[in-house]
Amino acid sequence: MAANGYEDVVKGDDAVPALEVQPQELYHAKSFWTRYIFCQDAKVIAVQYSLTAIAIGLVGLVSSWLIRMQIAYPGVIPMDASAYYQLVTMHGMIMVIYLLTALFLGGFGNYLIPLMVGARDMVFPYVNMLSYWVFLLAVLILISSYFVPGGPTGAGWTLYPPQAITSGTPGSGLGITLMI
């Protein structure tokens, strides 16, 4: 029978009540490779999401400056109508999808959800880590679409028809955006 209502963890003379068992420390990797590349810690992944979202947000900020400069002083920046429309499209997708979604869901979500539920980590840490690397790949493909012939898609940031119809849309197509 348990002493004081606790079930004994170890039977015998050295019985320790279950509520007095100290939590064990998790293994903390020491190298950069295991600490940041293959890390499955939700807080490290949250910092990675946040830094990536802020970096892509700076690209969106520069694109908003270019848009406003083109509106305020037409012709100062050598940009035709299709390039301007592509810039507006990429600015909208960067700010809404790649900045806000990643910062709030990936950054704050990974950092705060384990604290709110009282857990040490997320439920599927490997999938959580993999989702960040897929997001980073999508960001790199999105940025590389500026450098392909024809430029990025110019379908409007909502990607609704009739702007999203590829025959009338400037740019290299919708496949280069990789919205994951």
Describe each region flagged by the PLM:
Residues M1-I180:
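...captures the hydrophobic TM-helix bundle architecture rather than a specific catalytic motif
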